């Protein structure tokens, strides 16, 4: 389903050169759910951006669904890649209505801006929003900017999966939310991933989320994958064991340390 072969990404040149991702190999089968942890600047978000096509790799190859997409633009790749980022506003069009945002999501990766908002389409959107169980079905004509952060992120989850993608990328998509909304979004995300059998990569600093979500877990540092947990090893992992893993590799995660203090 998704394969990265010796993928590297560098920024700048000469003395200012920064290697964000270094000779990374990764394979995910359909339905795999990979959680990614690591220190700040470890290359986690860069890895997701490379898969989304936002950056071209400096070297290496990216294969999606059997096709080499290394040189395919982010716009064309958007037909196959769903993406949810940290900022609830960034994943939506705040000045447009909920219905217009969903119509845009249906046109992801196509030439047309959005399909006509017919009564039939409104009815379909209402049913899909009602399934979220947070009251958005009554706010189809509401501007997204007027929604709460949790509501916007729930909408972003629906938009990213409205046309089921081959790969779903979650880049700290609960980090800007309060604990209650973060829990709601994680549960909602798992529900969509499970029901649609989506191949998923999730970046998070939340160790409990990393353990509870997904089938595999990797730890990154300085652009490299240092460790991987899967199967029973991941299912039985605990937060202290993940902290010990950071310590073993001399990795410092400031956000993790803050969580432990609080």
Describe each region flagged by the PLM.
Residues 60-67, 227-229:
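Conserved ABC transporter NBD signature motif
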Residues 224-248:
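Conserved beta-strand-loop-alpha-helix hinge in the C-terminal portion
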Residues 37-39:
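The feature captures the beta-strand-to-loop junction immediately N-terminal to the Walker
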Residues 204-205:
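H-loop/switch region of ABC-family ATPase nucleotide-binding domains
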Residues 15, 68-82, 90, 112-118, ...:
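ABC ATPase NBD coupling module
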Residues 160-161:
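ABC ATPase C-loop
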Residues 52:
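Helix-to-loop junction immediately C-terminal to a conserved catalytic motif
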Residues 168-172:
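Catalytic Walker B motif of ABC-type/P-loop ATPase nucleotide-binding domains
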């Amino acid at each position: 389903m998704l394969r990265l072969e010796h993928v590297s990404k560098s920024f700048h040149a000469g003395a200012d050169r920064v290697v964000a991702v270094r000779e990374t190999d990764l394979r995910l089968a359909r339905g795999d759910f990979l959680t990614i942890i690591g220190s700040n600047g470890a290359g986690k978000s860069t890895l997701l951006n490379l898969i989304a096509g936002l950056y071209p790799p400096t070297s290496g190859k990216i294969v999606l669904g059997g096709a080499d997409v290394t040189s395919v633009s982010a716009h064309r790749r958007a037909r196959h890649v769903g993406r949810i980022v940290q900022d609830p506003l960034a994943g939506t069009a705040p000045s447009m209505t909920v219905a217009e945002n969903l119509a845009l999501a249906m046109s992801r990766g196509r030439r047309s801006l959005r399909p006509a908002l017919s009564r039939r389409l409104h009815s379909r959107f209402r049913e899909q929003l009602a399934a979220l169980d947070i009251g958005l079905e009554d706010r189809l004509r509401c501007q997204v900017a007027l929604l709460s952060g949790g509501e916007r992120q729930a909408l972003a989850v629906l938009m990213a999966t409205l046309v089921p993608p081959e790969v779903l990328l979650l880049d700290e998509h609960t980090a800007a939310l309060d604990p209650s909304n973060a829990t709601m979004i994680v549960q909602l995300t798992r529900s969509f991933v499970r029901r649609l059998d989506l191949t998923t990569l999730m970046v998070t600093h939340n160790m409990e989320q990393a353990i509870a979500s997904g089938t595999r877990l990797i730890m990154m540092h300085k652009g490299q994958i240092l460790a991987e947990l899967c199967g029973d090893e991941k299912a039985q992992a605990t937060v202290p064991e993940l902290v010990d893993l950071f310590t073993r590799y001399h990795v410092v995660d400031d956000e993790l340390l803050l969580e432990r203090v609080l």
